[in-house]
Curated annotation (Swiss-Prot):
InterPro entries listed in its UniProt record: Ribo_uL30_ferredoxin-like_sf, Ribosomal_uL30_bac-type, Ribosomal_uL30_ferredoxin-like
Transit peptide: 1-34
Organism in which the protein naturally occurs: Macaca fascicularis (Crab-eating macaque)
Lineage: Eukaryota, Metazoa, Chordata, Craniata, Vertebrata
MF terms in GO: structural constituent of ribosome
SUPFAM superfamilies linked to this entry: Ribosomal protein L30p/L7e
UniProt xrefs under Gene3D superfamilies: Ribosomal protein L30, ferredoxin-like fold domain
Keyword Ribonucleoprotein among UniProt keywords: yes
Localization: Mitochondrion
GO biological process: translation
Protein name, UniProt field: Large ribosomal subunit protein uL30m
Protein family membership: Belongs to the universal ribosomal protein uL30 family.
Amino acid sequence: MAGILRLVVQRPPGGLQTVTKGVESLIGTDWIRHKFTKSRIPDKVFQASPEDHEKYGGDPQNPHKLHIVTRIKSTRRRPYWEKDIIKMLGLEKSHTPQVHKNIPSVNSKLKVVKHLIRIQPLKLPQGLPTEENMSNMYLKSTGELVVQWHLKPVEQKTHES
């Protein structure tokens, strides 16, 4: 910058306009190489296909309502927006499952960090649990939510003779 100012001071007034025009072109951001560019992956890659449903065992007419999301890779040396999404989804601790709804807003966030996580459908073989069963449930590694039924003792009838 000092060299440009030295040129402005040493040149006659007619040359001043050409130097200032050159400075204006340097001030713009057109000459900066941006590191992150738009992804060149076509949209058809992200669309669901019948082969995917056969391969992964999904039903497009009856999709599952809940996801089990588990972070399986570290967020170190990842961009800040991926770290923010991991924090929003509650996946700071690795290999700890979190349950999320299968809705477009959540799915768009999951798509950004899909290389860091594992997504499984939540299977409910015994149906939706009730409030009383909430303490008697556990989650299998296969994605099944199992309710442990506690048997109540049978009351014995006393015979009066």
